[in-house]
Amino acid sequence: MKENKPVDPYAKYNEQSNIIAKIIFASRWLQVPIYLGLIVTLAIYSYKFIKGLWALVINVNDMDSNTIMLGVLNLIDVVMIANLLVMVTIGGYEIFVSKLRTRNHPDQPEWMSHVNATVLKVKLSMSIIGISSIHMLQTFVNASNMPEKTMMWQLLLHLGFLVSAIALAYTDKILYSTSHKTH
């Protein structure tokens, strides 16, 4: 005697839904060219750093201390932006595309062992504040050549970054404490 299996009325829907889910999941790979573009941008910043360092070295005898300080601050700014690019590239790829699988690599940065969206947001906001701080320092070292209105807007923008970072940290603290409460 042949057993009649019940017909699943949702079988076709489930199959289509599964195909859509696979397409959506695979779409994360569309970000790869973006991360590769960030690596190209990092190469551009490396070139800019070397060019700025070379200009500082060959012109050091013709520079006063303020000009040297501005040159050094510019180099620090380039380094901080490069660090930001590395964090976004590695962190974004790890979080949104695929694992890098570098767990046993001796040069793996410490922060990569616990990278997640929250850690990345905090690191990014701290980097942006650091970059903004360097720009503020450059502005105040060169204050005699800067319009007052430009300095005011830079200060307000920097304060906006600070307030945003504090709000982000506070929000993450609330979310973390709420999600980890024991009942």
From Swiss-Prot:
It holds the Pfam family UPF0114. The chain crosses the membrane at residues 38-58, 68-88, 124-144, 150-170. It is a multi-pass membrane protein. GO terms for cellular component: plasma membrane. Its main location: membrane. Disulfide bonds: none annotated. It is found in: Cell membrane. Keywords: Cell membrane, Membrane, Transmembrane, Transmembrane helix. The keyword Cell membrane applies. InterPro entries: UPF0114, UPF0114_bac. HAMAP family: UPF0114. Belongs to the UPF0114 family. This is UPF0114 protein CGSHiGG_05795.
